[in-house]
């Protein structure tokens, strides 16, 4: 196995699973592997489209830690598209919220999450 690949597996605590097929990994580990694989190309932007889809709350919490780790330790921007607002609020510094393709609100996370239109569209009243 390539040294760079093995190093990324270690960073994401997947090195002990290096000989396993990705399809046999738990869902949370599959997401970590997908992120590690993307990082192997040394991108400047990491686009994550609904990464928490299908995950249970424990897996989502681990995913949040993983994304925070990437955001804080790799020199790149993370663009997150996600409906899980607890994940979004736990990671994002800035938000742009769309509803049916129209921009509802944009700004700092805490401010956006207080916006009445955002609450109605995504958080429920």
Predicted regions located by residue number:
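Glycine-rich phosphate-binding loops of nucleotide-dependent enzymes
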Residues: 1-125
